[in-house]
Amino acid sequence: MANSSSFSPSTTVTDLISTVHDDIIESHILTRLDGATLASVSCASSHLHHLASNEILWSKICRSTWPSCSGGSRSFFSDAYSMVETAGTVSDLDRPFPELISAVDLHYRGKLIFSRVVKTETTTAWFKSSPLRIDLVDTKDTVATPIKRRQRTEDTCRDLEKDLTLSWIVIDPIGKRAANISSHRPVSVQRNWISGEVEAQFATVVGAVECVITVVTCGEEEMHVREVSLKVEKMEGTHLNGRDSLVILRSVMEGKRVNGSRREVESKKRHEEFMEKKREMKEKKMRVESVFDILTVAFGILGFVLLVVFCLWRTSI
């Protein structure tokens, strides 16, 4: 009777990989993978996990994915690549948070056209009480781009919606956490009919608020970036101040994460749901105000009628 033996597929794969020299795997295989694939490979075996944990690999991936970040690591990639599913609870509100770092990269058709790192002081009274607005482009400056403006505004908007991508990573240097609050591609692109500029909005919804990034482009032939800004907006339409915005951003950094591969689809879906709720809330508010106005007019007329009746009664005595 012939001897038979069974092999576990995972064991067979591991044995085959172990026959390949580590230098070949590190230099010719792992260096060709993107961050998401490298993370998946590291889960295949303990040997690959050890090789894929090389800090140099993750630093190169972070620099190529986010040029605004001069260095990086595996944990940073995990924070910045993943998408927030639900916001976390900020338990230590009294922990020092002296500055918020924003690392921003704007691409058009895969080509980097804007990259900047900005530090925002968070301890001043002005920051805490004023509506949060982080501007990356000076009001007097513009950034030249290779984007050509089409003859029809609709075509220009369609091009930007398809080819413009943005990463806005907020970093807590004390807590050593980060999160990408951009939707990667615009959730909306439209022309400002007053100024004629084209505005692209990227957004991440966090509960009843939305982190809105606005990119404003101008120019008749070759377009320039005139504004790249961040605000945190409530469903009622008002903007949160710096103190409350900081709590929201920290809850995003500490929230539950999911794979960021569906960031564009999920972000746009959440944005549309947010805007629908916003419209419903606005309509409800208008209905309440309309009823209040009707009651005010009715009571006014009733008061006037009673006053006339009272005056007539007095004159008849």
Swiss-Prot record:
Entry's transmembrane regions: none
Pfam families per record: F-box-like
All copies of domain F-box, residue ranges: 25-74
Name of the protein described by the UniProt record: Probable F-box protein At2g36090
